[in-house]
Amino acid sequence: MTYNQTRSQEAFEQARPLMPGGVNSPVRAYKSVGMTPIFAERGEGSRVYDIDGNEYIDYVLSWGPLILGHRDPVVTKAIQEQAEKGWTFGTPTELETKMAELVIDRVPSIEMVRMVNSGTEATMAALRLARGYTGKTKILKFEGCYHGHGDSLLIKAGSGVATLGLPDSPGVPKELASHTLTVPYNDLDAVRVAFEKYGDDLAGVIVEPAAGNMGFVPPQPGFLEGLREITEQNGALLIFDEVMTGFRVGYNCAQGYFGVTPDLTCLGKVIGGGLPVGAYGGKREIMEQIAPQGPIYQAGTLSGNPLAMIAGYTTLSQLKPEHYEEFERKADRLAEGFTQAGEKYNIPHDTNRAGSMFGFFFTNEKVTNFEKAKSANLEMFRSYYQKMAARGVFLPPSQFEGLFLSTAHTDEDIEKTIAAVEATFKELQEEFSL
C-alpha cells in the first residue's frame, strides 16, 4: 500500500503556530491515532477527498451532520438560492417558523422550540431552563456522556476529553463542578442512590439516549424508562441530549426509536444540514419560561439565521421513514462484517449500532458504560486507524467516537469497507501475535 500525506503534513506544519494544536477542535489533531491530520479538500456523496488526492469512503460525515452525504444537490441549491437573498438579518424570517413546525412535528417531546447556533449552546440553555423552572440547582449526568464544552458539563465527559485522557478540564471551578453529579451510564441503581441523597436539589437528569461520545453505546433495556420514572417521581426534568442522535437513530429521533419521551430535548448536527445550528425544546409549560415570554434569559445574534434554517429544513424534508429502514439494514451488514472479521482473525471486538450510528471496540467485553469502553485496546485502534485510512476508509480518529452512515452510502461502499476491515484485521493478527 502506498499512502501519501505530503501536502497534509505541510498544511499541518503551517497551521500549528497559528492555532492551538494546529486545529479548531482537539480531536482533529489526530493525536490518539499517531498520524498527520487528513486535510480535506472536497466531498461528494459518500466520499471525501484530501489535499493529497486520496479518496475515502466517509464515516465521519463532519461528525454526524451530513446525513444526506456531501454536497446533496437539493440542499446545495437551497443554500445558494437563499444566499442570493441574504444570509442574516437580525429580525425574524418565515424560515424559522417552517423549521420550528417541522421539528415539532417530528420530535415527540417538543411542543415549542428555540433555535441556537450549536449543540453546546442548546445544552447550556436547557440546564439553565431546568434550574429556573424547578428552582433547584444540581444536575445529574453520566460518565462518558459529552454534552458540549459548557463548564458545568465538562465533568467526566467523553469524546475528545476521553481521547486526551482528561477526566475534567482545567479552568472549571470546583464550586461549579460541585453542582454536577455523575454516575455510570446504564446504571439505574446509581441514579436512585443519587436521588436519595440529593433529590431535593436535583433540577434534572441530562443523558444521551444512545451515547455517542464514549464510542457508540446504546441504552440497556429499561434504562431510559427507568430515568423517566425516577425523574417524574422526584420532580426533576429529564433532558435528552439528541445533538448526535437526533434524526440519526430514527425518523422521530432516539426518543421515538426507544419509545421514551423526555421533558426537554437538545438538538444539533443533522438539523443544520452541515451548517452551525442547535436547538432545544420541550413541553410548552416549560418552554414558556424562556424570554421574552418568560423570565429565563437566552439569546443569540445568529440564532435561526436563514442559511442554517434552509439547510436544515431542506435536509429534514428529504428524510423519510424508509431511509431509516435502509440505515438499519446497512448498519446491520457493517456490524456483521466487523464481527465476522474479528472472529476470523481472533481480534477482540464488540459492536453496537442503532439507526445510522455504529460503534466498534477492540475489546471482548460487552461495552455498556464508560469504564468498559476504556478497556478497549487503544494501541490496536491506533494501528487499525492508520491501516484503514491507507485503504481509503475515513473513520473518526478516536476509539471514543461512533461512525455515521448517510443516504449516499451504497451497498458497494459497505462491502468495500468490510473488505478493508478484513485485510486490516489480518495484519493486526500478525502485528499483535493473536
Curated annotation (Swiss-Prot):
Cofactor requirement: pyridoxal 5'-phosphate
Residues annotated with N6-(pyridoxal phosphate)lysine modification: K269
InterPro entries per UniProt: 4pyrrol_synth_GluAld_NH2Trfase, Aminotrans_3, Aminotrans_3_PPA_site, PyrdxlP-dep_Trfase, PyrdxlP-dep_Trfase_major, PyrdxlP-dep_Trfase_small
Record pathway: Porphyrin-containing compound metabolism; protoporphyrin-IX biosynthesis; 5-aminolevulinate from L-glutamyl-tRNA(Glu): step 2/2
EC code(s) of this entry: 5.4.3.8
Keyword Metal-binding: no
Keyword Isomerase assigned: yes
Subcellular location(s) of the protein: Cytoplasm
UniProt catalytic activity: (S)-4-amino-5-oxopentanoate = 5-aminolevulinate
GO molecular function list: glutamate-1-semialdehyde 2,1-aminomutase activity; pyridoxal phosphate binding; transaminase activity
Any one Gene Ontology cellular component term annotated for this protein: cytoplasm
EC class: isomerase
Swiss-Prot/TrEMBL GO biological process terms: protoporphyrinogen IX biosynthetic process
Record key words, sorted: Cytoplasm, Isomerase, Porphyrin biosynthesis, Pyridoxal phosphate
Primary location recorded for the protein, binned into one broad class: cytoplasm
Family: Belongs to the class-III pyridoxal-phosphate-dependent aminotransferase family. HemL subfamily.
Oligomer status and interactors: Homodimer.
Protein name (record): Glutamate-1-semialdehyde 2,1-aminomutase 2
Source species of the chain: Exiguobacterium sp. (strain ATCC BAA-1283 / AT1b)
